[in-house]
Structure formats: structure tokens, C-alpha cells
Regions:
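Hydrophobic alpha-helical segments in the ANL/AMP-binding
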Residues: 1-7
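Generic structural signal for beta-strand residues in well-ordered domains
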Residues: 6, 50, 89-91
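Short, glycine/charge-rich flexible loops or terminal/linker lids adjacent to PRPP-binding catalytic cores
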Residues: 8-58, 65-75
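PRPP-dependent phosphoribosyltransferase catalytic core
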Residues: 75-140
């Protein structure tokens, strides 16, 4: 979904691989520091106050299911990038947003700003399969 948004808007897309299912403890793209630097508006290694260079970041996933992925991103980024700086909460709240195609209203993460449609998996336990998922082996 993020690549589609990027192509339609002409805004650069950066991949951030986070996988919390199938026994994986979580993994971050090797170059995750760009996110903090872009959101903070870092110039020459220094945080510029009121910097017009601070970028707005949209984190996109196909579904906010349990909320674990978005929560992990939030906690990992906060712990590794300027956690003691009081600017953190202003930057995170003002420059970083979350978007998803499907919002599970029963999710533990309440910070999704944009979604296409919603469902409540606590009321109806459905399993969604998106066209880009590996759902089996391809036979010629």
C-alpha cells in the first residue's frame, strides 16, 4: 500500500521491514536512523529548533490487526532516537502518522490517523488475505 501511495503522490517511499508473527521477535530496516533525522529536521548532525526541514512521515501497513506492529515501531523508534528530548512528543504527534487499509477497531493501538475501512475482529473473527501476500506456491 505504501508504494501505491508513493507512486500516486510522487513522494519518496522508504521501506521499513517489521515482522512480529511466525516466531520473529521483530526486525527493523538497517537504516532506521533516517526516520528520526527526517522527523526532527536534523541538519549537519544537530537538531534545528523549529526547523522547516522537519519532514512529515506516514507509516503505512495493510492492516492494523492487534496493533503490535505499530506499537513496536513506536517503542523501538522512541527508545533508539532522542528518547530524552522533550521534542520527541511534539515530533511524534505532529510529524509522524499511521495509515492502514484495514483498521481493526479491537486493536490495542489507537494511533491510526487514516484508514480505508474498519472491522471489529472482537465481534467477527475474520482472516483477510491481500493480493500481495504469499498464499501458496505458484504453479506454471
Amino acid at each position: 500500500p505504501a508504494t501505491i501511495i508513493s507512486n500516486m503522490t510522487g513522494i519518496r517511499c522508504e521501506a521499513l521491514k517489521v515482522s512480529l508473527r511466525d516466531g520473529e521477535a521483530g526486525s527493523f530496516n538497517d537504516s532506521a536512523s533516517w526516520m528520526a533525522e527526517d522527523a526532527y529536521g536534523i541538519l549537519d548532525g544537530k537538531i534545528a529548533s523549529g526547523s522547516p526541514t522537519a519532514k512529515k512521515i506516514l507509516i503505512v501497513d495493510d492492516i492494523n490487526d492487534t496493533g503490535a506492529t505499530f506499537q513496536w515501531i513506536t517503542e523501538d523508534w522512541e527508545s533508539g532516537c532522542h528518547p530524552g528530548n522533550d521534542k520527541w512528543h511534539r515530533v511524534w504527534g505532529g510529524n509522524v502518522r499511521f495509515a492502514t487499509l484495514t483498521e481493526n477497531l479491537a486493536s490495542n493501538f489507537g494511533g491510526v490517523s487514516y484508514s480505508c475501512h474498519a472491522l471489529n475482529k472482537a465481534e467477527e473473527d475474520v482472516w483477510l488475505v491481500y493480493p500481495w501476500e504469499n498464499v501458496g506456491q505458484y504453479d506454471d
